[in-house]
Amino acid sequence: MKNSPIGVFDSGVGGLTVARTIVDQAPTESIMYVGDTAHAPYGPKPREDIIRYSTAIADDLVARGAKMIVIACNTAASVFLDKARELYDVPVVGVIEPASRRAVAATRNGRVGVIGTTGTIASGAYQRCIANLDPNIEVHAVDCPQFVPFVERGITTGRQIMGLAEAYLEPLQDVGVDTVVLGCTHYPLLTGVIQLVMGDNVTLVSSSEEEGKEVPRVLYQEDLFNDANPEAESLDVVDANVVNDYAGPEPVRTFESTGDPHRFARLARRFLGPSITQVSHVEGLTDM
């Protein structure tokens, strides 16, 4: 079980921002990544459809031996996380809890903005999670439905996306938030635009980065680090990157798409660079 891969899935390429952090934080771990581009974006879809898509993909990953499931999609995590933890005997890591913890720690004035898909914002998942952590924090949530389609088309700079960001983020500027949660794993590709609009004095919390950091913590807690990792007496040893001296077999990282694998590969290289040499079409999931 320890040497099995980590299963990661998202509605498209956005979850690769999570995969990139996992690679940085746990470099000897193998990964199976599925991007459900056949059904992207998840944001505007009905809750029942998102749960159905997510269940089919997670079932497939577990059936292929994943030792952990990472839901690298805020929309999916907002409606599927609790169900997934009931369904599977492996740890399931979501994105909302770690990002919320970071936002609560980061805010100085107690006003936090959350941006995400329509589905994520409508679910109230971030609002509830942050309120549970600190009920005194004001949470101002804004849905940004066009951000994901722009990122999926590879458009992350330029006048059009800048104008869109200014319109979406104006309500957060008006209430004076000092921290903004990027509540979609596609949004780190828009960090430059969002930071420019919000200003340097506003802290951006990447849900992707926070979820990626959560993975080695859970691996340690569940004693699931693979045999390539050193014997660690605490998580601090793992965080110290002592694994860098390991000279054993290379981890296996596979990337699959329910849609066009060639288009996925072109976009995916913006997230993980040339390490993505091949993307396969995953069979049996497109008719979910």
From Swiss-Prot:
PROSITE patterns: ASP_GLU_RACEMASE_2. Substrate binds at D10, S11, Y42, G43, N74, T75, T185, H186. The keyword Cell wall biogenesis/degradation applies. The keyword Cell wall biogenesis/degradation applies. Its EC number is 5.1.1.3. Pfam families: Asp_Glu_race. It comes from the Bacteria. Provides the (R)-glutamate required for cell wall biosynthesis. This is Glutamate racemase. It comes from Corynebacterium kroppenstedtii (strain DSM 44385 / JCM 11950 / CIP 105744 / CCUG 35717).
